[in-house]
Amino acid sequence: MNANAQLMNFPIDNVIQLIRKKWVVQIINDLFFGKTRFNEFKENKPKLSNRVLSSCLKDMEDNGLIKRIVDKYDKKNVRYYLTDKGQSLNKIIYEMAIFSVDSENYTDKTKTELKLVFKEKLL
């Protein structure tokens, strides 16, 4: 396959397909910030229903972004973790976060603080 044909099958499309579903980027961000439980992902997301979150987590697991770990002694104790593939999105999430911070009307001090937090958690 020549270079032009490969560009027609744009590699970025694969990444976009992985993260395009609503809530995926927010959940990945939550995982980078240490959240691992179903109800933790719902915090500060009042419009995120249980059904949608379950579907989203299943899709993320099916696509190899997260792994679901069920406690062998307590089947109700379920945690989610980023896989290596999921963790490799750190730079993409970081750049999106920085773009967002720079695009909002934050004070310079707040922008600096937010960028530091994102750098610490994502890079």
Q: What feature does the model see in each segment?
A:
Residues 91-123:
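Amphipathic alpha-helical dimerization/coiled-coil segments
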